[in-house]
Amino acid sequence: SETVVILGSGISGLTHVQLSKNIGSKVISTDVSKYRLEQAKKFGADHSYHAGDLNSDEIRKINNNRLADKVIVCTVNDSAIKSSFNYVEKRGAILFFAVPAENISIPSNHLWRKEISIFFSYGATPDDIKETIKLAEEKKIDFNNMITHSFPLSKIIEGFKLVSEAKESMKVVVTGT
């Protein structure tokens, strides 16, 4: 089976944890939030690390002396983006799922020598949306348990405050009541 490192354990990261587990991958997740690391484990990550604690030696240690087959970047954090290039095995792949900064430094010789493929994701096609709905209906992706808080419209300010603090919440929903 493949090993996938997911950098960032927000909603996108948790979705990728579940997708990766669905195809039998070993999943290593990172984040700077202890709460989000706990969520990553809850959603199926085999290993969760504070972003500052994961390095290529640690990946090799828990992965039979190999780096990751795939790295999925679900954060805009510059150091995570830079680290992604060091976490991937020869002929592996990196997916930038989060929007990177306008200019990122890419170690082209390193990528060339290791024959690493880089992919970017932007938006979703109608077919992607249909597939996502199907996966949710089949209970292969659990979006409902990503909703950690719900606020009535009258408390929308409280909801936005919770989101902006980005502490112990994942997805916050505002209802029309």
Predicted regions: what they are:
Residues 14, 112-115, 140-141:
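Short glycine/proline- and charge-enriched loop/turn segments
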Residues 1-53:
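Mid-domain Rossmann-like dinucleotide-binding core that forms the NAD(H)/NADP(H) cofactor-binding site
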Residues 97-101, 121-124, 147, 151:
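Short strand-turn motif at the edge of the Rossmann-like AdoMet-binding core
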Residues 21, 112, 137:
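Anion (oxyanion) recognition and catalysis
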Residues 12, 16, 36, 59, ...:
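Aromatic/hydrophobic pocket-lining residues that form π-stacking "cages" and hydrophobic walls in ligand
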Residues 82, 126-177:
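C-terminal hydrophobic helical "lid"/dimerization subdomain
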Residues 3, 38, 43-119, 157:
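Glycine-rich cofactor phosphate-binding loops and adjacent beta1-alpha1 units
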Residues 30-32, 74, 122:
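N-terminal Rossmann-fold cofactor-binding loop
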